[in-house]
Amino acid sequence: MIRTYTQRALAQAWLNRFRGHLPAFACILGFTQTGLIPGISAAGATPADRQYTAIADAEFLLNGPQPQPRYPLPPLTAGASPVLISHAVVSGLGLPVYLFNAGLPIPPAVSAIDLGGEPARCLSTGAALNLATVHHLLTQGLVWGETLADQHPYLLLGECVVGGTTTALAILTGLGYAAATKVNSSHPICNHAQKWEIVQQGLGRSPLKPSHPAPLDLVAAVGDPMQIVVAGMTIAASRKVGVLLAGGTQMLAVYALARAIACTEQLVWQPEAVVVGTTRWVAEDPTGDTVGLAEETDIPLLGSQLSFVRSRFPQLQAYEQGYVKEGVGAGGCAIAASLYRGWGQQELLTAIEAVGDRYSQVSAGSGG
């Protein structure tokens, strides 16, 4: 149920080390005004919808389907939120969940740890975040990474940031990686040209030195608040436990950022304790090159082989047409279910469709 795509020996050793262990799931919520650009993301049908995606996903992750949620899941162009997958695993396995608000314009309706961050301005400004905020969020990430590592055998670090694959492209490009046509998106065919134009604008307007900018300055110029928090958590947690960065393009960028920060800030970490885990919809997306990006960033890439080909729900079948693909740690959660409980295709699909059934019932009952 879990395929290794890059650095297979390291990836397999990591899987063997943590098989049978129950991780904690930390989901870091953030916001960038990049996500409001028309057409930039399919994680919400309109820019107005996308303002609420992260807080709606957070509420659903903890509470599951409810008759009258404070923030209902936003309508999508096609498909269903990946939080259905994440919630099915969290509830089925009893995963400890920690929600972190790294910088949201509206706080979630459920309990979340407020890290004192701020939403990012559009990366095209070249001034996405205040540098003081970036330093503060790195410190928070380091502190919480160490704290959680003291309590759990390994950490599953997920995210919800609409527009986050575009800020990921900006970070990867700024760090010197040739990522322009390799990233993914929530669209069935990745909008590479749109992303690249925005990234070029942001890097061009920023005060960064073109060759080898300092990583914290780079985040301040074109990043988002989630990235720096998860990079800090990864560095600190890796000293004691394993880290599964749950996501695709965004988590490859976080890994590259963590490595750059550890180097420039002279922070000790254990990169061999870290892997990226995603869905096969991301890993095998023909309109991106996740495997090539993982090879370039030099990290083991895992992918859950979860399939929705035979799902009863058209919204889930849409994943097989390239819609949505990943988010809210969905791929990492599926990997954790297979590692901890040996869940295969049938167990995962049954659990996810049970959540889908409940969601359909409460949506119909509330007129949603």
Swiss-Prot record:
It holds the Pfam family DBI_PRT. One of its GO terms (molecular function) is nicotinate-nucleotide-dimethylbenzimidazole phosphoribosyltransferase activity. InterPro entries: Nict_dMeBzImd_PRibTrfase (IPR003200), Nict_dMeBzImd_PRibTrfase_arc (IPR002805), Nict_dMeBzImd_PRibTrfase_sf (IPR036087). Belongs to the UPF0284 family. This is UPF0284 protein Cyan7425_0342. It comes from Cyanothece sp. (strain PCC 7425 / ATCC 29141). The lineage of its organism: Bacteria, Bacillati, Cyanobacteriota, Cyanophyceae, Gomontiellales.
